[in-house]
Amino acid sequence: MTCLYPGTFDPITNGHLDVIKRALKIFDEVIVAIAKSEHKKPCYDLEKRKELALLATQNLKNVKIIAFDNLLVDLAKELKVNTIIRGLRAVSDFEYELQIGYANHALWEDMETIYLMPSLKHAFISSSIVRSIVAHGGDVSSLVPKEILPFLKDQSCM
C-alpha cells in the first residue's frame, strides 16, 4: 500500500525524514508530495525544494518525490492513493491538521489521514525554525539532512 506525505518542505528537515521513516514501517511506498504553496511564500522555489528532498531521501528505499500545484485530493485521486500521512509535533498542530483532514475527507469520501508523531528528539524541528537559525548564522547541522547543508548557506531568501 502507498501513502502520500504532502507538505511545503521549505526545506526538508530531520523531522520530515523521521516521519517518512515511520511511514515506511506501515506502508510499502511513501510518495513525498511537495506543494507549490504560494500562500506560504516559500523561501525556496518548488524545483529547489524537490531537489533538496531528493538529496535527503536518496538512501531510502520506496520513497518517491513529486511536486504538485493542484488540490491534494485531486493529486491523490490521480495517483490512486487514498491515504495521507501528516506529522504532528504538538497539540497546536493537531487543531489545524484535523480541519485539513476533515476538508480532504469532505472532498473525497475515500480519503483517510493518518497522523504520526516524530521522535521526541525531532518534535521541535520545523522548516521555519531552520530558516530562522540559518538567517542568523546559526548551525542547523543537527536539524537537517547533511546532504542539503551546502544549499542552506545561501541565505538570500531567509
UniProtKB/Swiss-Prot annotation:
**Annotated residues for binding of ATP:** T8, F9, H16, G87, L88, R89, E97, H122, A123, F124, I125, S126, S127, S128
Subcellular location(s): the record lists: Cytoplasm
- Class of enzymatic activity (EC top level): transferase
**Highest taxon, organism lineage:** Bacteria
UniProt key word Cell division? no
What InterPro entries does this protein's entry cite? Answer: Cyt_trans-like (IPR004821), PPAT (IPR001980), Rossmann-like_a/b/a_fold (IPR014729)
- Reaction equations catalysed: (R)-4'-phosphopantetheine + ATP + H(+) = 3'-dephospho-CoA + diphosphate
Q: Which organism is it from?
A: Campylobacter jejuni subsp. jejuni serotype O:2 (strain ATCC 700819 / NCTC 11168)
Name where it mostly resides.
Answer: cytoplasm
**Binding residues for substrate:** T8, K40, L72, R86
Q: Which keywords accompany this UniProt record?
A: ATP-binding, Coenzyme A biosynthesis, Cytoplasm, Magnesium, Nucleotide-binding, Nucleotidyltransferase, Transferase
Name this polypeptide is given: Phosphopantetheine adenylyltransferase
Residues of the signal peptide: none
Q: Which NCBIfam families match?
A: coaD_prev_kdtB, cyt_tran_rel
Q: Into which family does the record put it? A: Belongs to the bacterial CoaD family.
General function of this protein: Reversibly transfers an adenylyl group from ATP to 4'-phosphopantetheine, yielding dephospho-CoA (dPCoA) and pyrophosphate.
Q: In which pathway does it act?
A: Cofactor biosynthesis; coenzyme A biosynthesis; CoA from (R)-pantothenate: step 4/5
Q: Per the entry, which co-factors are needed?
A: Mg(2+)
Site description Transition state stabilizer, residues in chain: H16
What is one term from the GO cellular component aspect held by the record?
cytoplasm
Q: Which PANTHER family match?
A: PHOSPHOPANTETHEINE ADENYLYLTRANSFERASE
Q: Describe its assembly.
A: Homohexamer.
User: Which Pfam families does its entry note?
Assistant: CTP_transf_like
Catalytic activity, EC: 2.7.7.3
Molecular function terms, GO-annotated = ATP binding; pantetheine-phosphate adenylyltransferase activity
GO annotation (BP), single: coenzyme A biosynthetic process
